[in-house]
């Protein structure tokens, strides 16, 4: 890369890949832009009392496409999480699901946090509060938006999120299906035990 030309951001790289694919297709007017953009991105900021003070956290959940319900995509915990990243990852989830004919739209979420900086009980409080903020907006829901583990999260975090959803939706008989990647003893299924990263 030359000194006068900056490297594209992750989001810009996804758009460049999309542009190359679209150039090979005959899409009706307006459809290209509809496919390119995310339907919605939600930013949540919440506080949790930890270590004698209120700690404020920022999280995101982006829904790229709801052409098929539910939407599906991981939740990551990392200090570099931002809106552009979750929107790009949500778009990639839509494309991946479409290519392999999984009947789901794409979504992705993240919490700007270094999970290694927190004790397990603190991380549980943070995760449950994040899940609460998402669930009250139907951004965790078995028939609408189903998160999964991603970088910095795993079975433990998915179990906490599923339990928080269940506590908020006591009459939902499908509450265990609100996330995937849970441990078997929390309603998960045999299979992958590690997430991306």
Predicted segments with their positions:
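N-terminal ligand-binding/catalytic initiation module
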Residues: 1-196
């Amino acid at each position: 890369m030359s000194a006068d030309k900056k490297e594209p951001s992750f989001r810009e790289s996804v758009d460049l890949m999309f542009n190359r694919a679209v150039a090979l297709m005959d899409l009706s007017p307006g459809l290209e832009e509809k496919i390119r953009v995310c339907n919605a991105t939600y930013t949540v900021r919440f506080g949790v009392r930890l270590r004698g003070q209120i700690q404020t956290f920022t999280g995101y959940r982006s829904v790229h496409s709801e052409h098929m319900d539910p939407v599906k995509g991981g939740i990551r915990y990392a200090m570099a999480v931002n809106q552009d990243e979750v929107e790009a990852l949500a778009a990639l989830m839509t494309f991946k699901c479409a290519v392999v004919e999984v009947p789901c739209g794409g979504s992705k979420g993240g919490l700007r946090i270094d999970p290694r900086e927190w004790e397990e009980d603190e991380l549980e409080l943070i995760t449950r509060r994040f899940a609460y903020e998402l669930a009250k907006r139907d951004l965790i829901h078995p028939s609408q938006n189903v998160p999964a583990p991603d970088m910095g999260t795993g079975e433990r975090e998915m179990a906490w999120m599923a339990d928080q959803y269940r506590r908020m939706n006591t009459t939902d008989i499908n509450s265990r299906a609100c996330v995937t990647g849970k441990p078997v003893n929390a309603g998960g299924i045999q299979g992958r035990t590690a997430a991306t990263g």
